[in-house]
Every structure is written in C-alpha cells, then in structure tokens.
Regions:
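GAF sensory domains
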Residues: 354-425
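Bacterial carbohydrate/catabolite-sensing allosteric modules
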Residues: 1-333, 340-345, 352
Length: 425
C-alpha cells in the first residue's frame, strides 16, 4: 500500500500483444474503481527458451517492492518459463502476499489458480444449432488429434448430438489443426462430396471458422443462408470477419470485475480456494443467422483496420529513424539528445551505477541484477539533455510518490543488452 492506496503487481510478457492487453485493461479499470493502483512488470519476450537474454529480461520481476505491493498476479499463459514463475511465487510467498495465477497450464508450488471453463458455452452453442435452427446434419472440424482442448470440444459436440438423437456421419469430420491450410484441405474433401454440404459446420476455433467462411464465399455458398458456420475463442480477427461469427468468448469486462472481487477478498485475509473458474459466454451472431449483416459495421471495421495499419506504419517509421541515428553513435550526450524525441516525457530510463563504464560483471538474474544504487534519466519535453538522479534500487516504487495520485498504469519494462537489464518505467 502507498498513501492509502492498495497496490496490485501484474506480471506479464509481451504487453505489445493485443491478447495480453485485452486481459489487462478490464482488470485495471475494475481495480481503479475499487481504489487500487497497479504496477505492470513486463518482459518483451515470453521467456519460453529461457536463454541468457530471457533471464536478463526476467530481472524486471526482481524489482517488485513487496513493502508496497499487496497482491501479485502472474499471467502464466504468456509467461512461458516455469522456473521464472516459481521464482516470482517464492518471492511473493516469502512476504506473505496473495498470488493469483491466471490461466495456468500446469501445476505450480502455490498460488490461487484462475481458470476458464469452455465446456458449458460450447455445449450451449451446439444445442443452439439443434434447438433454435433445427440442424440435423452437421460437419465438424477439430484441431490437432490428441490436443486436450480440441478433444474435449469434440467430445461435447458428439455428446450433444447423441442426447438429441441427431446422427453424425464420420465422413463429415476432419482435423484442421487450428489454422488455415489444413482446414482448406478438409473443406476440399467436404466440397467434393456428391451429397452436398451439411446444414452446419462446427469449427473448434475461430481461425478455422474464418477459413471456412472464406472458402464458401469463393464458391458462391452463402453463410448462413446456405450453410451455418460457428467457431470458438472470440479472437481479435473475428471482429473483422463478415459475417461475424457465432462463437464462444471470454467476457473480459465481467472477468475483470470477477477477478477484482477475488483480489479484494484475498487482500482482506479471507480463506481462499485453490482454484476459481470463470465461464466462457455463448455469443450468437451473424454466421448462424441470429443477427443481421450490417454494412455500417463493415464500414466501421474497415476504418478501424486502416487506423491500425496507419499507427503501425508510423511506429515502424519512428523505430527505423531512431535505430538509424543510434546505430553508430558512441557519444552518450548525443545518444540522450536522440532518445528524447522517441521517449515519453513521463518516462524514466534507469540503469546500474557504472553502466556506461562497462562495469556489469556479476549483475545477472542469478546473482544481483541491479546495483544497490541506480541512475535514472528522465527526458523532459523541451530539454536537449535528460535530467539525471540517483536512488536506491529497492525503492523504485516508493520513489514515484505521485503513483497513487494518478490513475495511470505504471509500467516497468526491461531494456536488455546481452544478459544485463536496464529498466524503462
């Protein structure tokens, strides 16, 4: 806690990834409404390879100041190094802080697990096609053979058909391996059948459903008038597919509210279960015919895509310009002058004492990644050179005394050179 505000530490990777952002933003807003503040600790890679560079990146998590942090959340779906997750868990448990593991794919030594239940929503989807659209002839495109998620959804699909007395011909089953090219091969087989297509094609994920819609469109087969197509996941790409898919998705606004309530309970010292489950939601839409196609929605989607492409192009241009200017520059003062055009004025660049003198020996993830005292540079608007100051590395959060007063997500990100870590916050 700082100045009366409770503080949650969010441990993630690749915040530049839209899926990660979509998980963080609703929770952050929900916690703000409950008078919390958040610190985001992010790595630019998912740490899967666990290389020396990855370990340098992971040093960012050793900056967590547990004297001010009340609760820790670890997004294990994007942090893919078990050892690093266990290190965060150990540090938090040492300070008796509650830890939430968001969507864990394996068992860890502690923490409160937050999982998602897909089964009910997918069951409702298949029942919806039978009970509301009176489908009696189905095709199903699954993911990988042996994949647990795919096999569970396939089992649910078959169970619902059996419960409703709907026969299923195995010739209408195939593995699309969760992506486009294998799905195309399955669809070519379906389209070659002399009987013609069934009434509905149930896909185990949205990516395969989008591919199916594209192939049917190319053949002049209308969705949903001629064939119903459904997906599962609610991926970002689905927002730009027309017709919009009937699918199952996570309602992340509700999830943010659900999780923030659990965080408050854990922080209050309530006895918590080892695992909590949040359900997926059935979203009936255009590809089954429950919602009408809208040209207005198409126009909005096209404009959104253009804006995203334009923002991406501007970002690429800025990064290229910065790298071109910095590549062969060795004068520290000139480096600082260049950086001020590319770094926000509310950003600090922090590094170990002696960094510019090459004195980094021993400061790695396994030892002490940060010196007792660090140097920070802040790039104020209108100044050619940054303002420099020094402070103790163990008090980063307390140094930012304006943190609780501002409804801003304070982010700590590594700038890693080889296995040594600088920090941008």
């Amino acid at each position: 806690m700082i100045n009366g505000y409770k503080v949650a530490a969010l441990c993630v990777s690749e915040i530049q990834n839209e899926n990660t952002q979509s998980m963080i933003a609703p929770l952050y807003q929900s916690l703000l409404e409950k008078n919390w503040r958040c610190l985001l600790f992010n790595t630019t890679t998912d740490l899967f390879r666990d290389t020396a560079f990855d370990r340098g990146e992971a040093s960012i998590f050793q900056l967590m100041d547990f004297s001010v942090i009340d609760v820790v959340l670890i997004y294990t779906q994007c942090l893919k190094c078990r050892a690093i997750v266990e290190d965060i868990l150990t540090a938090a448990q040492k300070h008796r802080k509650p830890v939430f593991l968001i969507e864990p794919t394996e068992r860890y030594s502690g923490g409160i697990r937050i999982s998602f239940d897909e089964a009910d929503a997918f069951r409702y989807l298949v029942k919806h096609l039978i009970e509301q659209h009176h489908v009696t002839k189905f095709a199903c495109i699954a993911g990988f053979k042996g994949n647990p998620a795919s096999e569970i959804r396939e089992m649910i699909f078959r169970d619902v058909l059996k419960e409703h007395g709907v026969p299923f011909d195995e010739k209408w089953f195939g593995y699309g391996n969760f992506y486009s090219i294998p799905t195309q091969e399955v669809m070519e087989r379906f389209l070659a059948d002399p009987e013609g297509l069934p009434q509905a094609i149930v896909c185990i994920n949205d990516s395969m459903a989008i591919t199916v819609c594209e192939i049917l469109e190319e053949r002049g087969i209308r969705v949903p008038e001629d064939v119903i197509v459904t997906g599962f996941d609610g991926i970002v790409q689905e927002q730009y597919n027309f017709p919009r898919l009937t699918t199952c998705r996570r309602n992340l606004d509700r999830f943010g509210s659900f999780l923030s309530k659990l965080i408050e309970r854990a922080n209050a010292g309530e006895e918590m279960k080892r695992e909590y489950v949040f359900p997926y939601t059935l979203d009936v839409s255009e590809s089954c015919g429950c919602r009408k196609f809208s040209m207005k929605a198409v126009g909005l989607a096209v404009n959104s895509i253009y804006s995203r492409m334009n923002n991406s192009a501007q970002y690429d241009r800025s990064m290229t310009n910065m790298l071109t200017k910095l590549t062969f520059e060795q004068d520290v003062e000139k480096v600082n002058e260049i950086l001020r055009y590319y770094i926000r004025s509310d950003t600090y660049l922090c590094m170990n004492a002696g960094f510019f003198h090459g004195d980094q020996n021993g400061h790695t993830y396994e030892t002490e990644p940060f010196t007792e005292e660090v140097t920070s540079l802040r790039f104020f608007t209108g100044r050619k050179t940054p303002k420099s100051r020094r402070f103790r590395s163990g008090s980063w959060c307390r140094t930012g005394t304006t943190l609780p007063k501002e409804q801003t997500l304070w982010s700590f990100m590594p700038c890693t050179i080889s296995r040594w870590c600088m920090v941008i916050w």
